[in-house]
Regions:
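Extracellular/periplasmic carbohydrate-active domains that bind, remodel
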Residues: 1-214
Length: 214
């Protein structure tokens, strides 16, 4: 890449890593009607994506609960692709605040609420104890929280504490690029113990009256 300005030329040489596999999530039976639960189908695509591969989600509205990324993979949301959060909180897994070790001394932080390691629902997109993950494209993560009960009495714990839109914990080399994240259940992007996190050219859209969606 070369840039010329004020008589000077600046040059940057770089090499992008090769994409090993292109995984079309539509082949896993996605139903783009905005109503059918696609959680298992989408997770199957993410979980079976080989190292260095990209999971491609075409345009459409895909209802889903929590999804979990794996290391060395990319999630590409095509323009017009919307991952639409499930409105039923009982469809979301609950993550323990901490996991104790066998020696009963060490603990592993998994999630929390307002600074405390408390059991919470898993987010719409979870990046947990992984590395080299990219989420990119012009698509949207829409938690659709306004159409559930997530914003009703938000300080009251119901089953577990509210999830995040994107929850990243104990991970490294994470990039969110180009996407839109909106209508979050609570905090929108929540990184904890994350090294080398890039947030590039992406949008956050939450209504002014949405509680704690900063």
């Amino acid at each position: 890449v070369e840039v010329q300005a004020e008589g000077e030329t600046l040059k940057l040489d770089f090499t992008t890593e090769a994409e090993t596999f292109f995984v079309d999530a539509a082949r896993y039976g996605l139903v783009a009607d905005g109503e059918t639960d696609n959680t298992v189908r989408l997770q199957a695509a993410l979980s079976t994506c080989p190292k260095g591969g990209t999971v491609y989600v075409p345009a459409g509205r895909y209802r889903t609960a929590s999804l979990f990324m794996k290391s060395n993979t990319t999630l590409y949301l095509e323009k017009g692709a919307v991952l639409l959060g499930d409105n039923d909180r009982t469809h979301y897994p609950i993550l323990p605040g901490v996991l104790p070790s066998e020696n009963e001394v060490d603990e592993y932080y998994l999630t929390g609420w307002e600074g405390n390691p408390l059991d919470s629902f898993a987010g719409l997109l979870n990046i947990t104890q992984v590395h080299d993950v990219v989420v990119t494209g012009e698509g949207t993560l829409d938690c659709d929280a306004q159409n559930g009960d997530w914003w009703v009495n938000p300080k009251v714990k119901r089953i577990a504490w509210r999830p995040r839109a994107v929850a990243a914990v104990d991970s490294e080399n994470i990039c969110l690029h180009g996407i839109t994240v909106q209508n979050s259940y609570s905090w929108t992007i929540h990184p904890v113990f994350v090294k080398h996190l890039d947030l590039l050219n992406f949008n956050i859209n939450n209504p002014y009256n949405a509680p704690n969606t900063d």
